[in-house]
Each structure stands twice: as C-alpha cells, then as structure tokens.
Amino acid sequence: MSAPQLLVHDHRDNVGVVVVEGLAAGSEMLCVITEDDFDFRLTVKQAVPIGHKVALTDLKVGDTAVKYGQDIGRIVAPVARGEHVHTHNLRTKRW
C-alpha cells in the first residue's frame, strides 16, 4: 500500500485528517482507518492544509463532527463529502 494522504482513527468518525503537504483540490486521496487499516479513496474538493480535517460524509448544520470516535463540535454550515472542515464550518459545543 502506498502512503495515505488522510487518516481516520475510528469507524465512527465522520472527518479525517490530512497528513500530507500540498493537497490540491480534485486530488484522489488514499484514506486509512487506523483502527484496523481499512482503506478507501476520497476526492478532496478544495485544497486542504496538512493537519486539517476533511468531511467523510455530507454534514448538515447541527450535525456533530466526530474524530477519534469523539464529539469534537457542531457543524454550523453545510459541508459536502470531501470538503474542508475547520473554523468556518465547525464550532465547539462548550460555549
């Protein structure tokens, strides 16, 4: 298997983390779920910086973003599968 561009930690996750520099819009990524090494392909719709998240499914306003099998926040703007997930469309539920 070649090196993955996106890591997902848990099968419950609906976002994954970009682990390469220079990921361009339209790139087909090799994605790996680290829990069991399951792999799949996903096309990224925007350029996404290393360390940032990508939606694995379509997410609507009010949905919970899940990373590491844990709630990491609430979606505040619609996000399509393959789009960048960050502070412009994700907020903490703490306040």
Region annotations inferred by a language model:
Residues 2-95:
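N-terminal small-residue-enriched
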